[in-house]
Amino acid sequence: WEARTLWGSLVNVSRNLAVKTRQFVAPEGPQLDRMRDLIISFSYALKDHLRGEPHITNKLSVQVPENIKHTPNFLASQMYAELKKWNHADQLTGEEFWAMDREAHMFLEICGACERIKSTLMSRSWRIVTRQCIILYLLLTPWALVEEFGYWTVPVTVVGAYFLISGEAIAHYVESPFGIREDHLDLDGLCAKIEESVKEICDT
């Protein structure tokens, strides 16, 4: 749920920064196009970063140097470079600059929180204890039930084992929500949503 909340926040801050760029800096032109491309590229770069995939995909509309290892950081720094340039050119008032700075700041906050989720996995000892409990259940339950349930002991034990094993498998996927399985967070869909929303704000 935390990962879903973070990516929901990324959708919102992407829209907010696009709106503020258009309203505060330029209703159209290369400045707006540049920030639009940075915002869209950030979401795809973060997706690839969390999945451990190559950091340059065909969805990135911003050129990223080959020596860059952390593409989301690079793109966020480019956003700040744009803000700094506009501020020095007096295209932003102090209040407008701080309003946009708050949005830009959130990109790295979200990235850091997602990295924490990815790196903070369930401890190995906890996994071992969980599996030992399941094995113990499978070994002891039939003996506890056989006198009362007779032949029904087997299906009762199987059903219980199914739910225990399923719960352990679900916990494994939940602790690492950024993969590509159906049970994982739909990062591709969220990136496409951000791209669609930001383009709608900037191009219409």
For every predicted segment, state its role.
Residues 1-8:
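Juxtamembrane membrane-water interface segments immediately C-terminal to a transmembrane helix
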Residues 8, 14, 18-21, 41-45, ...:
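Small-side-chain structural scaffolding
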Residues 10, 30, 34, 38, ...:
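Aromatic-enriched hydrophobic runs in primary sequence
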Residues 11-43, 49, 178-204:
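Solvent-exposed, non-transmembrane helices and loops of integral membrane proteins
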Residues 17-126:
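Structured inter-helical modules in multipass membrane proteins
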Residues 116-204:
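Alpha-helical transmembrane anchor segments
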